[in-house]
Structures are given as C-alpha cells and as structure tokens.
Amino acid sequence: IAYSLKLLGGEPLPMAMLGSDGADYLQRLESLDIDCRHVGQVQDTYTAQAMIMTDRDNNQITAFHPGAMMQAHANRIDVGAKASVGIIAPDGRDAMLEHAAQFVAAGIPFVFDPGQGLPMFSGEELAKFIDQASWVTVNDYEGKMLSDRTGWTLAEISRKVEGLVVTLGAEGCEVWVAGEKTHVPAVVPKQVVDPTGCGDAWRGALLFGLERGWALPRCAALGNRVGALKIAQRGPQNYTLDFAVE
C-alpha cells in the first residue's frame, strides 16, 4: 500500500511490526523514501510471511505466518497524530480493533478494509468498525460475508459511511454512496503476469484520491488503473506508472 501511495506522489506513514529478520525490508522502504517512524521491530520472532500459490487462472491459496504482526497493537496512534486519512487493512486482530478506536480519538477519517482478516471478527465487531469508519472497501466475497455477519445489505452499509466500494477483479468495482450503486469499469492490462499485490496497489491509489478530496468513483478508477499496471509485472513492488496523475 505504501509503495503505491508513494509512487503516486503521496506520503505514506506505514504502521507495522517487523521481526528480528526485518532489517533488509526496512532498508528497502527507506530506500524508497518512505517514512518508517511507525515501523517497530520485535526481537526473537520472525516478520509476518505469506506464501501465495497462484494457478494458471490466477486463483490463489495463501499460507500465512503472522509472527511479529501479532504485536502490531503495540504501535499506537496518538490523539495528537497528524494525518489526512488512514486505513485499517489486514493486521493483527488486536491492532485492527485498537487502531480503529485510536483513529476515532485522533479525529482521523479512515478506510475499513478488513480483507482476509474479516473472518476474525463477529457481526457486532464488524458493525462497530463500520460505525467508526468513513469508508469501507471489500471484494465481492468479503462483501457477502460482511452483509451476512452484520445483517446489513450493501446499500444499508453505504448509508452508514461516506462510501462503500466492492471490488470485482476483472469486472472493475461497484461504488455505493448513500444507497446508490455506480459501476466503475476495470482497466484492461497489457498482460496478466502476477495478481499478487493488486489489492494493495488499488488501496494505495484509493488513499491518494481520498486525501485529495476526490469523489469515490474517481478514487476507484485510479485504483483500477494502478492495479492494471501492477498485474502486468511480477512481484508487488516492481511496477511503475506510465501516466501522470492530474
């Protein structure tokens, strides 16, 4: 997410916990001029690792070890923190709950994007996240689960926040605002090489647009465009922009 946001011209402030093996990755972020003041390190444990297996149809199975991520709640968002917008993306369970409350206390609007972390939470907890958030983003599968667990339709969820986005992969995405749905078409990539990191590329673009006060469909369209660039390159941090952001 931070790579995408920085590439577009934003100034990300990632909050994360690395393990004792994380020095090279921290150096990588710093080489990209990404501010790492909120990246901590936990000794005697490994950095979170995901092994993602992708078939020829781009279906994926992920094996995940959380490692130091389980201590991510030790990072705190102070009441006086200065940020335009934040995101609650997949993280340790305690960190997601606590950081959402801390965003609210600091008066920082945020996106709730639970991703693969969604099954960790009860319907009551998910409802509270939605009440705290300014925006919600999910894929179509997560959207169904979110509706099932909260008992709210997508239209109802969209009325509780400033906007809801449901990503649909190659079909683009649906933007819900005040109960009304708008389809934002996908951008056709030059080639399909590797889907790993497409969601994070999209998230970074979303944050870039929200920080600038763009309407949600415009933010989603930029996300689709950056995601199309990412999928044409192998690896989550090897793509570059082929356009200027206006």
In which residue ranges do the predicted regions lie?
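Gly/Ala-rich phosphate-binding loop of Rossmann-like dinucleotide-binding domains
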Residues: K6, V104, E211
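Conserved phosphate-binding/catalytic region of the ribokinase-like
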Residues: G151-E246
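Residue-level signal for inorganic ion chemistry
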Residues: L5, G86, W135-N139
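Conserved phosphate-binding/catalytic loop of the ribokinase/pfkB sugar-kinase fold
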Residues: P14, R37-V42, A50-D94
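Substrate-binding N-lobe of the ribokinase-like
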Residues: I1-Q49
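Conserved phosphate/ATP/ADP-binding segment of small-molecule kinases
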Residues: E98, V104-P185
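Short, acidic/turn-prone active-site loops that include or flank metal/cofactor-
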Residues: S20, D44, H65-M69, P114-L118, ...
